[in-house]
Amino acid sequence: MSDMRLIVAGAGGRMGRALIRAITESAGATIVGALEAPTSKWLGEDAGTLAGLPANGVKLSADLWALSADADGILDFTVPAATLANVAIAAQRGLVHVIGTTGLSASDDAVIKSVTNQAVVVKSGNMSLGVNLLAALVKQVAKSLDDNFDIEIVEMHHKAKVDAPSGTALLLGEAAAWGRGIDLNAHSARGRDGVTGARRAGDIGFASLRGGTVTGDHTVIFAGPYERIELTHKAEDRMIFANGALKAALWARGRAPGLYSMADVLGLGNAST
């Protein structure tokens, strides 16, 4: 099979540059497009040079329709508004759409789901193998422990991250909720401050820390009577997300239309969300 021809959305950002490197260093894929916002200062720049690699002749552009004429897929780690705009074009063009954008609302998710009867979409709050295995463990632990074990999720990211809790924290929260057989939206505790009263039984708590250059640390705490279990993942380089996204795109090529997750890509069944 020929190399999969991929577009990187948000090519000028940290994740975009990591994705360019991952594709360039891979076997089985090639970069044919680099997408940026119409106001980006990187428009017209060479994608390879921008990623710290030799020039590859792919110039950053704001025109996804033109870029997608000869593409097979798009890797999208941008912002919700950009992802929603990309979804429509990717579906029309028949592109595999790998979405790692975080901060998406329920209505955003509904828009994405609406195209999956005609398009292949792989969407996850985290594309790394380690986090998705962690989610599988969280499901099993939450299912196995009695409900007198309180669940708290602590995450830390670099100071430039704009959404909280992180997409990964929410993924882990969904995994814990699945294990408990509850709806996360109805049992989510965020932003505790002041006199909050006693902890509500059954809640899944979230705490978000921001500072420095932290790529991503996540800990799921199961706090029970006189004992505590902590499951932790620490991301040391964005390349783990980029390589995971590339793996997802290659896996999704030729699949039937639908909405897939990294659990599907990694063969974990329903072990993560």
Swiss-Prot record:
Compartment(s) of residence: Cytoplasm
Metabolic or biological pathway: Amino-acid biosynthesis; L-lysine biosynthesis via DAP pathway; (S)-tetrahydrodipicolinate from L-aspartate: step 4/4
Residues that, per the record, bind NAD(+): 10-15, 36, 100-102, 124-127
GO biological process per UniProt: diaminopimelate biosynthetic process; lysine biosynthetic process via diaminopimelate
The reaction(s) this protein catalyses: (S)-2,3,4,5-tetrahydrodipicolinate + NAD(+) + H2O = (2S,4S)-4-hydroxy-2,3,4,5-tetrahydrodipicolinate + NADH + H(+); (S)-2,3,4,5-tetrahydrodipicolinate + NADP(+) + H2O = (2S,4S)-4-hydroxy-2,3,4,5-tetrahydrodipicolinate + NADPH + H(+)
Keywords, sorted A to Z: Amino-acid biosynthesis, Cytoplasm, Diaminopimelate biosynthesis, Lysine biosynthesis, NAD, NADP, Oxidoreductase
Residues where (S)-2,3,4,5-tetrahydrodipicolinate binds: 158, 167-168
Active site per UniProt: 157, 161
One GO MF term: oxidoreductase activity, acting on CH or CH2 groups, NAD or NADP as acceptor
GO cellular component: cytosol
Top-rank taxon, per record: Bacteria
Pfam assignment, any one: DapB_N
EC assignment: 1.17.1.8
First-listed, main subcellular location of the protein, grouped into a coarse class: cytoplasm
Alphabetized Gene3D superfamilies for the sequence: Dihydrodipicolinate Reductase, domain 2, NAD(P)-binding Rossmann-like Domain
Tagged with keyword Cytoplasm: yes
Keyword hit for Cytoplasm: yes
Function: Catalyzes the conversion of 4-hydroxy-tetrahydrodipicolinate (HTPA) to tetrahydrodipicolinate.
Family statement drawn from the similarity comment of this UniProt entry: Belongs to the DapB family.
Name of this protein: 4-hydroxy-tetrahydrodipicolinate reductase
